[in-house]
Amino acid sequence: MKKVLLTFIVALISLSASAQRKGDFAVGLRGGPTMTKIEFLGIKENYTRWGAGAFVQYNLTDHFRFDLDGIYHFKKDHLSDVTVGLDLQYLFDLGEDVKFFPLVGYALAFTHQDAYEVNNISSDSENSTDGGIQLGAGIQFNLGDNCFVSAEYKFQPGILGDGHVVMASVGYRF
């Protein structure tokens, strides 16, 4: 866990050091629900969790950018997690202030389950890591030269089950 956090911090620092031109670098806040379909030992369950976090974007060209985010999913049923994802997005201009982007990336989820007891059966505290690809799309609306809002959908097959992530974001470009 410490190595992953250190890698995340180094990535943030290196992105900020290389962002020299206006519009190349953005930061912001992101939040929304994650709907997960969990199948285990013949049991199927749909599970919705809410998450919030931050993101950093770096434009490689006028159309390609990296999006690095960290999302904390609030505790539900003794389970919480932090998901760190890195996406490559391709931007299509739909108008002067509107962009559409498909995305492909990879995410790691670091989960923590608290110890609990149900019907005299106890569970130990447990930490685990899961990872996999994520595919999706989003739309961005520019609010002037530096501010923007966006919405995106990501499908995460195999990350803590099959996850469907819907996020709204607000950001600021440097």
Kindly label every feature range from the protein language model:
Residues 40-47, 74-81, 96, 130, ...:
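Solvent-exposed loop/turn segments connecting transmembrane beta-strands
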Residues 19-60, 66, 72, 106, ...:
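Short glycine/proline- and aromatic-enriched beta-strand/turn motifs that initiate or cap beta-hairpins
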Residues 1-24:
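Cleavable N-terminal export/targeting peptides
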Residues 25, 62-66, 95-98, 141-149:
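Repeated loop/turn-to-beta-strand initiation elements of outer-membrane beta-barrel proteins
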Residues 33-40, 71-78, 108-114, 144, ...:
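Sequence/structural signature of outer-membrane beta-barrel proteins
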Residues 57-59, 89-93, 109, 140-142, ...:
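Structural signature of outer-membrane beta-barrel channels/translocons
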Residues 78-104:
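Helix-adjacent hinge/juxtasegments
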Residues 50-54, 82-86, 100, 131-137, ...:
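Hydrophobic, lipid-facing positions within transmembrane beta-strands of outer-membrane proteins
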